[in-house]
Amino acid sequence: MVIEIKIYYHFLLGETMSYFWTVCVPCYNPDERLEKLLDSVVAQNCKDDIEVVIIDDCSTKDYSNILDKFKDKLNIFKYETKLNGGPGPTRQRGIEHSTGEWITFIDQDDVFLPDVFKDVKKQIEEYPTIQTLVNTPFYIVDAVTNQITQYLPNADNWIHGKFYHRENFLLKYNIHFCEDLYSHEDIYFSTLVKGVLNCNKLPYIQCNTPTYNWYTYADSLSHKETETGLNYLEEYFGEYIDSILEPVMQLDEQYKNKDFTAKQLLTLLLFGYFYIQGFLYYNSTNFKRDNITKFRQLLDYTEDCLGLTNDEIIQWTYNNPKDYFDIREKAAGGTGPMIETYSYASFINEVKPQVKNNDS
């Protein structure tokens, strides 16, 4: 999907500047919550270090009145897409139009915590040779009660609370958002990040200071996956598989690192198995059979790529019981508690019966 962009709205304080940070904000019909986000950027008290790149994804209402309030406080660059593409392609346009040395992504209805950029910059200056990624914890917060509902110290499949070196990491290694995914775009991007770090043995900085409040709202597109849970996951199960499978295929072709490839594919098979068990447990009557087909395609690729039989794939789970139960617990976070209709072994063999040679 190709999305054309034009410069639509632009504030710039003073002459052309070189920025340390780019804050990329995908926007669609934002309201006063965008103002709260921008207030949290102003409160960092380092405006000369920061550019705010707003990528508007075909909003149907004008919100220039919100941006006007910040024309003397922030360096804001606004671009407008020609085609509504969702958060993935919109964030990709943000990378392409950013100029900061480091880039971070934030949703239009979330906020940064105080002194984030100063604290993270100190970490970067302590390790000047590490120009890849700064990973930080963040909070999930109920927007109605303003109570923290979850603390995520190391959410590696999320882009939130992370700061990426634009030139020496994202651009150098072609880490990008997929143009064709409407959902799970952050998993696709994060899989590329993990693969590049792992396959090139690159270090990154782990910062222990929380940087970000991720708010849950009933009307937020970016949070509907959490809101609708099981139904969302079942509807977009194919895109979930593709969001990991496609970057793993790219990385396998480029790096030939079978240890990384095997770990990702075998883990993805387990997640797929548990998700399907959840679908069957909660909605067996209207279960989408296409999701079995998608799982079979993943199983076919895993066997072809790694040269493994069904029995060898199943044996991996027996050899890694901690991974098995950790993945089951994480999967239950999306589907809810479940009773497995089939064991992993019987499910694998039913999806793709193992052909056995009989000696005559």
What are these model-derived regions, one by one?
Residues 49-58, 78-83:
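Short beta-strand/loop segment that forms part of the nucleotide-sugar
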Residues 113-181:
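Flexible acidic/His/Gly-enriched loops in nucleotide-sugar-dependent glycosyltransferase catalytic domains
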Residues 82-98:
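Glycine-rich, basic loop-to-helix element that forms the pyrophosphate-binding segment
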Residues 30-43:
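Short, well-formed alpha-helical segments that are part of the catalytic scaffolds
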Residues 151-229:
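Conserved nucleotide-sugar donor-binding catalytic segment
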Residues 56-65, 107:
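A conserved acidic beta->alpha catalytic loop
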Residues 12-13, 17, 279-360:
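Membrane-interface aromatic/basic loop that binds lipid-linked glycans or pyrophosphate carriers
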Residues 103:
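Short aromatic/hydrophobic "clamp" motif used to bind/position activated sugar donors
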